[in-house]
Structure formats: structure tokens, C-alpha cells
């Protein structure tokens, strides 16, 4: 799938949805159709006995410190990167399944995803994010550094040969980029 190709729209392109994900240490945001559709704490609740994830986001956050000892809450991201691979993958999957516009679809759409990643991320961590996205139906997965995404988000012309400083203050990391 080359985005620059001159071929007509593929027959199944109508079954592809575009989403952008900002996986943060404190919060996860998902954008679909130019709207923030998920803005939720990056936290999961796991049943200690079965190992099953029973809640994510706001619901899991409300359980923190208030449930019996068989339910443990986990923040699957540390310093902006995946610390608990399985928990973060389940969290992403459950967040995507809760996107209102995608719930109404007859078929599960293929997803074209743009995911924000911190600048200091390693190749292994990048691969973990990409593989996680592919397992939750990401057919095309693009990774973009958070300061670059912030620059584009505020409308800076990133192709212009002029310097700008971006300060991205997150829940787990702060990045400064020029």
C-alpha cells in the first residue's frame, strides 16, 4: 500500500479507518475523524488469579486502591514507553473497541494508525509498539516522534527551513526539540 501511488482507490479502502494514538504514561488519547474519541488514563485492572484484563482507562482508574486484593491496577507505560507489553496491548485493543463510530461498523475495519512515540525510544521499544498495533488490526502503522506530532498539531509548517522549539510536557516525560 503506497500512499503516493496513482492507482484508483482499492475496493476495500472503504473498510479502512484512520486513527491517531498518543500513548502516554498518564493518559492515552485516540483521534478518529479529527475528533478526540478516547481521552482516558493509561491504566488497566487485571485479575491476579486469571491474569485477565477486566477494565481499562477511567473504569480501571476508579478501581485503583478500592478493590479486593485479587484485582491489581497497572500502569503499562513507564517514561512514555511500554513497560508491560501484554497489558498495554490489551489496553489499546479495549480502547479501540470502545470508539463509538467503529462500534457501529458491520465488519471490523482495518486500521491505518499513526502512533506518537518519545524521541528517546529504542528500536526494540519501537518494534513493540508497532507489533502491538498490528495485533489490534493495524494494517498500516506509522510511528511519529511526539515533538514532531506536537509541531504538526499546532499548525507549524515543518517543511519550512526555519527553526522552532517545541516543548512537549507529558505525564511521564518532557521533551524539548528544535
Give residue spans per PLM region:
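Nucleotide/phosphate-binding catalytic cleft detector across ATP-hydrolyzing
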Residues: 1-171, 177-178
Amino acid at each position: 500500500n503506497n500512499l503516493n501511488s496513482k492507482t484508483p482507490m482499492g475496493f476495500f479502502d472503504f473498510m479502512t479507518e484512520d486513527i491517531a494514538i498518543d500513548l502516554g504514561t498518564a493518559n492515552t488519547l485516540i483521534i478518529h475523524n479529527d475528533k478526540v474519541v478516547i481521552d482516558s488514563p493509561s491504566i488497566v485492572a487485571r485479575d491476579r488469579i486469571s491474569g485477565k484484563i477486566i477494565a481499562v482507562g477511567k473504569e480501571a482508574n476508579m478501581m485503583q486502591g478500592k478493590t479486593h486484593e485479587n484485582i491489581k491496577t497497572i500502569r503499562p507505560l513507564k517514561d512514555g514507553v511500554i513497560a508491560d507489553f501484554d497489558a498495554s496491548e490489551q489496553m489499546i485493543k479495549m480502547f479501540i473497541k470502545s470508539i463509538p463510530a467503529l462500534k457501529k461498523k458491520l465488519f471490523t475495519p482495518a486500521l491505518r494508525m499513526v502512533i506518537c512515540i518519545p524521541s528517546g525510544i529504542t528500536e526494540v521499544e519501537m518494534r513493540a509498539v508497532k507489533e502491538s498495533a498490528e495485533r489490534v488490526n493495524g494494517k498500516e502503522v506509522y510511528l511519529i516522534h511526539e515533538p514532531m506530532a506536537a509541531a504538526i498539531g499546532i499548525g507549524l509548517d515543518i517543511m519550512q527551513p526555519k527553526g522552532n522549539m517545541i516543548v512537549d510536557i507529558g505525564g511521564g516525560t518532557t521533551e524539548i526539540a528544535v
